[in-house]
From Swiss-Prot:
Name of this protein: Chromosomal replication initiator protein DnaA
GO molecular function: ATP binding; ATP hydrolysis activity; DNA replication origin binding; lipid binding
Keyword Cytoplasm listed: yes
Amino-acid positions noted as binding ATP in the UniProt annotation, renumbered to this chain: G162, G164, K165, T166
PANTHER family: CHROMOSOMAL REPLICATION INITIATOR PROTEIN DNAA (PTHR30050:SF2)
Self-association and partners: Oligomerizes as a right-handed, spiral filament on DNA at oriC.
Lineage: Bacteria, Bacillati, Bacillota, Bacilli, Lactobacillales
Length: 455
């Protein structure tokens, strides 16, 4: 029998010939062979979603290729990275699966059949940089683009601004159009959906509105959290959702939070949004930020050294949008000064342009330090579990300011406060927001702290 790695390399090579580039890079390339016994090969994959995809779509192909190569029946046994780490947690060394997919940036193929989909042709799977914080979301999006209306319906992305939710949503639509140019795809923001509904009611064209939204193959709705408190919109969308779901049409939604955390969202909508798969997207780590910048620089034809990219990535840890904005500002500064892009030039450009994020020094630890000093409590108190009022209110204010003044995700804020659940952060933010309307003392405290942090 072939050795484990030899057999794996042969199987990978064969699959690469048969599968699309994106499918291979997403599901096969990150996989790692751990052990080969007589009848099975144990393979590690990044997430449960990867394992499900392998078991449904790739296991039989694996066995066929192995049979041809060894004349033996060998089946793949999938194990997730987390499961493997639990099994080997007593060991010091850990296998690194890689945060970035490592694919070279490619020029996106612009579909020539954009019609009225409102899809951005630049938002494709090819232009999406995969990292630890978005790996599962990317894999789920790819599955949905290949098998809409079957496996994950609805697909619900949630996370902070500028992390790639909209990019993945558009990538699904663009991929489906490449596969079937006749597909009827509708992309809309929640605000546009509401405005179109209001207009339809005013002009008495509700039936035309329903016809437009209930006869699509793929419905993409961005920022669903803005449906909160809009009863008529929720009522209409409830029936639209049902019509599409019952007809096996794919629905993809995005939000800055989980369905059950959206205030004043009808329980029946919350329930339906949970029928499929909810996937969070978290801020990119350093390696992913560098890869994002390199990808953007290559696409834009910007000449920039690797150490300079690393410097930019080290300055900004909030989101992709701000990263790309920083690169654009650096490019403009370089042109204005007719100078090549260097680390020194980048430092000057970002300083003079007052870029936010780390450069403004407003971070969660800084907020905690200011709040602790203001209320005469300790940092340990803010991060601890004490429930007395003298501690709880400063802690909630610190969480509120972390949500308002940084781009950090809810889970990250929770982690900075001693591993609190993200729902605790939401509760704190909502409570302070409500109290600020009537509590003059609280208004002064929050105002003082905000002024200190922004000065």
């Amino acid at each position: 029998m072939l050795e484990r790695n030899d057999l794996w390399n042969l199987i990978k090579f064969s699959m690469e010939q048969d599968l699309s580039k994106i499918t291979f890079q997403t599901f096969v390339e990150p996989a790692k062979p751990l052990q080969l016994d007589k009848a099975q090969m144990t393979i590690e994959v990044p997430t449960q979603l990867h394992r499900d995809y392998w078991e449904k779509n790739l296991a039989a192909k694996f066995t066929d290729i192995a049979m041809q190569a060894t004349n033996e029946q060998i089946r793949p046994v999938m194990i997730t990275e987390e499961e493997r780490q639990q099994l080997t947690r007593d060991k010091d060394s850990q296998v690194t699966t890689g945060n970035v997919a490592g694919q070279q940036p490619t020029t996106a193929t612009t579909p020539t059949f954009m019609r009225e989909t409102k899809l951005n042709p630049k938002y494709t799977f090819d232009t999406f940089v995969i990292g630890k914080g978005n790996q599962m979301a990317h894999a789920a999006a790819l599955v949905v683009s290949e098998e809409p209306g079957t496996m994950y319906n609805p697909l619900f992305f949630y996370g902070g601004v500028g992390l790639g939710k909209t990019h993945l949503m558009h990538a699904i639509g663009n991929k489906l159009l490449e596969t079937d140019p006749t597909s009827n795809i509708k992309y809309v923001t929640s605000e546009s959906f509401t405005n179109e509904l209001i207009n339809a009611i005013q002009t008495k064209k509700q039936e035309a509105f329903r016809e437009e939204y209930r006869n699509v193959d793929l419905l993409l709705v961005d920022d669903i959290q803005f449906f909160a408190n809009k009863e008529a919109t929720q009522e209409e969308f409830f029936h639209t959702f049902n019509a599409l779901y019952e007809d096996d049409k794919q629905i993809v939604l995005t939000s800055d939070r989980l369905p059950n955390e959206i205030p004043q969202l009808q329980d029946r909508l919350v329930s339906r949004f949970k029928w499929g798969l909810s996937v969070d997207i978290t801020p990119p780590d350093l390696e992913t930020r560098i890869a994002i910048l390199r990808n953007k620089a290559d696409l834009e034809g910007i000449e920039i050294p690797d150490d300079t990219l690393s410097y930019i990535a080290g300055q900004i840890d909030s989101n992709v949008r701000e990263l790309e904005g920083a690169l654009a500002r650096v490019q403009a500064y370089s042109r204005l000064n007719n100078s090549p892009i260097t680390t020194s030039l980048v430092a000057d450009a970002l300083k003079s342009l007052h870029l936010s994020s780390k450069l403004s020094e407003v971070s969660i630890p800084v907020i905690q330090e200011k709040v602790a000093k203001y209320f005469h409590v300790t940092m340990a108190d803010l991060k601890g579990k004490k429930r007395n009022k003298q501690i709880v209110i400063p802690r909630q204010i610190a969480m509120y300011l972390s949500r308002e003044l940084t781009e950090s995700s809810l889970p990250r804020i929770g982690n900075e406060f001693g591993g609190k659940d993200h729902t605790t952060v939401i509760h704190a933010h909502d409570k302070i927001t409500k109290a600020l309307k009537t509590d003059a003392e609280l208004q002064k405290a929050v105002g003082d702290l905000t002024g200190q942090l922004k000065s």
